[in-house]
Amino acid sequence: MFTQRNKVFLVTVLVVAVLFSLALVTMAKEYVPGTPLKVGFIYVGPIGDLGWSNAHDKARIICEDTFPWLETVYIESVAEGSEGLYIDKLIMEEGCDVVLTTSFGFMDGTLISAQKYPDKIFAHCSGFKRNPNLMTYMADFYQIYYLNGLIAGALTKTNKTAYIGAFPIPEVKRHMGAFAVGVRETKPKAEVHVRWIYEWFSPTAAKEAAEALIADGCDVFAFTEDSPTIVQVAGEKGLPSFGHYSPMYDFSPEYVVSGQIAHWEAVYLDFLAKVYAGAYTAHNLADVDYWWLLKEKAVEMGAKPGMLINPAYEDELKEKKVNDPVLGMISVYDLVMKRLEQMSDPSMVFDPFNGPVYDRDGNLKVPEGLRMSVFELTTIDWAVDGIVGPWE
């Protein structure tokens, strides 16, 4: 027999349950096109890293400044594997309509969350798993790493260039491979020596890796790590390097030759405008994959915006010649400019992974007359000829 206290308790429980259910319905409500849009970003590193996460956050700010109907929030320094908890926070507490996760290691957690919240819109950067409410996107640098490789091959005196990688995942292996293709094109006997640091942002590990490679005789540096540490360490030794993701010229003006600069805003502005207009919904994203390159202006080659190549290196690159099968005898400087023009053309008449391309064991991976598909590029796991060092 219920006492008055039991009845009050039961009513309280029922009221709480109803309110919680209503809250869930409200949070799960599908976005209505043309209404204010709230977007949450999840970053793997700190926004002050001056690399990957910093570039994404600059793009977020550009989007918010461009669209009066857009509100954004972000969470930084999220460990890969814990993204699901933060996605819950963005949806349950912040009320986000769209969640963008910006690291390869967030892929599985993002897919699980997309299935958990089928009425919300998700976008995952650098991955390949999609869902009706989950699209993928990438502003990829492999073309620019190839161009940087052309320059590195021309500049190395020891025939040992260096690439310090964060994690041995397809994205980084693709960039290393393109860099190696470029190096071998201008210096056939040169090598790309690899060190992994197993961190996206670790100035300490980056410094140790750079110093070890310098001790091994490497004299030109490329990398995937989200700080300017490597350009600073190389510069202190008078060695050239290439900036990564954000402009790094100011950290070593004499020795940053060029680099890769991301314009994530190109992707974000296009995607969010289409969500706002109703072109993209929580039901039609399974086949949406932004694979944006030079021709879409999602990436830029340069030591800093507007400076393709540091003027201090232009004369040396103009003096050094290579014999290209199609272009004939040409300076490295002119070759870089020609390849940049070709890859920026909408028809993209040249690609770094045009065959023949061999792996470092001598196996033909891309036959002559063919080029790697987007899927092959995004899942690459083999080392291009010329790469030296551990691969996992």
Give a label for each model feature.
Residues 2-13:
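Bacterial N-terminal signal peptides that target proteins for export
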Residues 3, 28-392:
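A residue-level marker of the well-folded mature domains of exported/periplasmic proteins
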Residues 12-21:
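Bacterial N-terminal signal peptides
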Residues 22-28:
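Juxtamembrane cytosolic interface motif at the C-terminal end of transmembrane helices
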